[in-house]
Design a protein with these regions (language model features):
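Structural recognition of alpha->loop->beta junctions
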Residues: 1-6, 67, 73-87, 149-162, ...
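Substrate-binding cleft and catalytic face of glycoside hydrolase catalytic domains
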Residues: 2-20, 28-139, 189-191, 202-204
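Short glycine-rich, flexible loops that bind phosphorylated cofactors or substrates
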Residues: 15-16, 170, 237
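Aromatic-rich peripheral "rim/lid" segments of glycoside hydrolase catalytic domains that contact
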Residues: 19, 57-60, 77, 81, ...
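His-enriched metal-coordination microenvironments in redox/metal-binding proteins
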Residues: 40-49, 158, 165-171, 233
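Extracellular glycoside hydrolase catalytic/binding regions
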Residues: 128-180, 191, 195, 202-214
Length: 269
């Protein structure tokens, strides 16, 4: 593969997509992704198991006991079908004000629900790296997220922390030093770190290039960062305007050309 050595399905692996009707699983889109990955020897990261958005509509109407069963059945079904999944975003955006899964909080009332969900993932996905994923992790909400996830980390069920990196430039441009300091602080918790959803929302080529050159080397060279995922790459096909790095005809934007040259030079060291 010219550009990538890891795949993260953006929507195809979310619970509400796969199990829109309880007990009926639609694996068609995911099967294609895993087949492609296996043929090309590319690891897959699952995204995501438990989130307050894009969950099946039927889950909120169940009793707590049935919600617990449904969550476990979903996790078990996924990892039974795709046991070679290398990494999993187990819980996504659980900080209050983000998108915490109310159904999971209800299912495990009286306990730390994040820890309980990770325990289920550990039980059924023993060979996968289990990750907590959230936005504003490197910026405004670092302390809140660390406080939220610490019990699960202390319980030994979290392997990595995923830092969505969509908004490093608006409404404030975070300097390279500020991002390094944040990585140091988060890394002190002891888990692996992942830049999980990196994009640069800039239609101006020079602006996108400048931001890429500012932050990517900080990610790449930090000892705790084990991987970087770009959140979409084809212009006009990404979730936010201006984040694409390659035109549909294959022409690279300057930020992509710089990135490829940077990685080539780094690997030659």
């Amino acid at each position: 593969m010219k550009y990538w050595n890891q795949i993260t399905p953006e929507n195809e692996g979310k619970w509400g997509v796969v199990e829109a009707t309880r007990g009926q699983y639609n694996w068609a889109a995911l099967d294609k992704i895993y087949d492609f990955a296996r043929k090309n020897n590319i690891p897959v990261k699952a995204h995501n198991f438990v989130w307050g958005q894009q969950a099946p509509s039927w889950i909120s109407g169940l009793s707590a006991a049935d919600q617990r069963t449904a969550i476990e059945n979903w996790i078990k079904a996924y990892c039974t079908r795709y046991p070679d999944t290398v990494m999993i975003d187990v819980v996504n955006e659980a900080v209050e004000g983000h998108a915490p899964a109310a159904y999971a909080k209800n299912a495990f009332a009286g306990k730390d629900w994040i820890t309980e969900v990770f325990k289920l993932a550990r039980k059924h996905c023993p060979n996968s790296e289990l990750i907590y994923n959230d936005y504003n992790f490197l910026t405004w909400d670092t302390d809140k997220i660390l406080a939220l996830i610490k019990p699960a980390v202390d319980a030994g069920v979290v392997d990595g922390l995923g830092m969505q990196s969509h908004s490093l430039y608006s409404p404030k441009v975070w300097s390279a030093q500020e991002i390094k300091d944040k990585l140091d602080k988060i890394g002190a918790l002891g888990t692996d770190l992942y830049i999980s959803e990196y994009d640069i929302e800039a239609t101006n080529d020079q602006t996108q290039l400048d931001y890429m050159k500012m932050h990517f080397p900080v990610f790449w060279n930090h000892p705790k960062v084990k991987g970087i995922t770009l959140w979409g790459y084809v212009v006009g096909k990404t979730w936010r305007t201006g984040t694409g790095l390659i035109q549909e005809n294959g022409t690279e934007r300057p930020a992509m050309t710089w990135l490829m040259n940077y990685l080539k030079e780094e690997r030659a060291k």
